[in-house]
Amino acid sequence: MVLIRVLANLLILHLSYAQKSSELVIGGDECNINEHRFLALVYANGSLCGGTLINQEWVLTARHCDRGNMRIYLGMHNLKVLNKDALRRFPKEKYFCLNIRNDTIWDKDIMLIRLNRPVRNSAHIAPLSLPSNPPSVGSVCRVMGWGTITSPNATLPDVPHCANINILDYAVCQAAYRGLAATTLCSGILEGGKDTCKGDSGGPLICNGQFQGILSVGGNPCAQPRKPGVYTKVFDYTDWIQSIISGNTDAACPP
């Protein structure tokens, strides 16, 4: 009952937030309820982000999603019809790389969160493994989130929307954004029409079944031609992530 009341309040805040932001999943369709068991909804001080459960105790999201009063929801699909196995967790520990921001791009935009209590696999909750190889240009990738499905005016879905996009040549994003970090991926549709943006920050980019990216930044308005999304490249951080999880909290980030 408490979780239901919390989610009702979250919906109200979600509506308010969407009126301020046009940068979310555009050009997609409703996700299948069984395709996003790893997807987390991260809520902190009026801001919404996505996240990815990578084992029973850890979630990956974007560094710039870090705000006070963070709550992490798992097992969610329709925000108006609560799944029986939906859970709420809080951060027990947070880990970052040194984060530098210029006027356009976040560098090392990654945050590893240890949950206050582990979760169990269930009908709507299961982790997504870290990648074994980096993606190649042209790879088909899946993105998802609960954000607005129209831009610039907001239209909110009750369920997360998913879209297929592609890994693009790094030069496309270099031309679109100043100061692009080397540990990022460029992904979208070159001619526009499908994309993720700010409101889905921290959500996953899944290419050929592997968790390859964390949404960092995108164009505004979103889904514009030659303005694809920029994603933190998860493969480059796998050693750091695994070291932190194993207890080496002084592990070095990639350069």
UniProtKB/Swiss-Prot annotation:
Enumerate the Pfam families for this protein.
Trypsin
Cellular compartment(s) = Secreted
Top-level lineage group:
Eukaryota
Looking up InterPro entries in the UniProt record yields: Peptidase_S1_PA, Peptidase_S1_PA_chymotrypsin, Peptidase_S1A, Trypsin_dom, TRYPSIN_SER
PROSITE patterns hit by this protein: TRYPSIN_DOM (PS50240), TRYPSIN_SER (PS00135)
Taken from the UniProt record, the cysteine pairs bridged by disulfide bonds within this chain are 31-162, 49-65, 97-253, 141-207, 173-186, 197-222
According to its UniProt record, the EC number is 3.4.21.-
The UniProt entry, under SMART domains, shows:
Tryp_SPc (SM00020)
- The residue ranges crossing the membrane are none
Q: Which residues form the propeptide?
A: 19-24
Instruction: Please name the GO terms of the biological process aspect recorded for this protein, alphabetically.
Output: proteolysis
Q: Which residues are glycosylated?
A: 45, 102, 153
Instruction: Check the record and name the Gene3D superfamilies matching this protein.
Output: Trypsin-like serine proteases
**Residue numbers annotated as active site:** 64, 109, 201
Peptidase S1 domain location is 25-246
User: Into which EC class is this enzyme placed?
Assistant: hydrolase
Keyword annotations from UniProtKB, A to Z: Blood coagulation cascade inhibiting toxin, Disulfide bond, Glycoprotein, Hemostasis impairing toxin, Hydrolase, Protease, Secreted, Serine protease, Signal, Toxin, Zymogen
Tissue specificity, in the record's words, reads: Expressed by the venom gland.
State one molecular function term (GO): toxin activity
Quaternary structure, from the entry: Monomer.
| Reported function | Snake venom serine protease that selectively cleaves the heavy chain of protein C (PROC). This activation is thrombomodulin-independent.
Query: Member of which family?
Result: Belongs to the peptidase S1 family. Snake venom subfamily.
According to UniProt, the name of this protein is: Protein C activator
